[in-house]
A protein has these predicted regions:
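Hydrophobic h-region of N-terminal signal peptides that target proteins for export
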Residues: 12-21
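Alpha-helical transmembrane segments
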Residues: 4-12
């Protein structure tokens, strides 16, 4: 009898950690936890890793099998998903970014979305469409590093489409404000002056 009680007690002690870990697993799939995990990974620029928890968060259903109500966090999760698609150079990123703008036309992220669409067109070599989207965005409202990247692409678009006057203006502006692009801008400004026959 003593052996039976000790076996039961031993089994209970061995199974207790398994029960505790099962409860932890349930907590990790809660909507709030999924959102926080995805947001943290996104902020760390681990875009590929952020997609899975963010998609799981967006697909969450309530007890009746209906999608959870549209909250600010849901919109933010969808924003992070389309930005992750852009950062990972998804071929469908332009469509995803445009669909996000169609779904949430009043989003506070609209300016950045326009800049990302423009940048996607730039990387495809579609400079006219890139210029149209860059001109829809206010680059001065972006973060410093992203603003400089987008301004460089804008100036390059002007150069590629033959508008050397605008290209020179943007390259000169960027040269005076960005250390990262100062050498590249100086090169392009010299190139533009050379093509115009100005050797000063």
């Amino acid at each position: 009898m003593k052996h039976k009680i000790s076996r039961i007690l031993c089994t209970a002690l061995c199974c207790a950690p398994l029960l505790a870990s099962a409860q932890t697993s349930e907590k990790s799939t809660s909507p709030k936890r999924l959102y926080q995990e995805g947001q943290t990974l996104f902020q760390q620029k681990a875009y590929a890793a952020a997609i899975s928890p963010l998609q799981a968060y967006v697909r969450q259903m309530n007890a009746d099998g209906k999608p959870l109500p549209d909250t600010g966090e849901r919109q933010e999760a969808e924003y992070m998903l389309v930005c992750a698609a852009y950062e990972l150079r998804d071929p469908k990123s332009i469509d995803l970014l445009r669909a996000f703008l169609d779904e949430y036309p009043d989003t506070p992220h609209a300016n950045r979305i326009y800049a990302l669409i423009a940048s996607s067109y730039f990387f495809e070599g579609n400079y006219d469409d890139a210029l149209a989207m860059f001109n829809s965005a206010r680059l001065d409202l972006l973060g410093t590093e992203e603003r400089d990247d987008m301004t460089y692409r804008l100036a390059t678009c002007y150069l590629k489409t033959g508008n050397v006057k605008e290209a020179a203006i943007w390259f000169e502006t960027l040269r005076s404000t960005s250390r990262k692009y100062s050498a590249d801008c100086a090169y392009y400004i010299s190139y533009i002056r050379y093509t115009q026959g100005r050797y000063d």
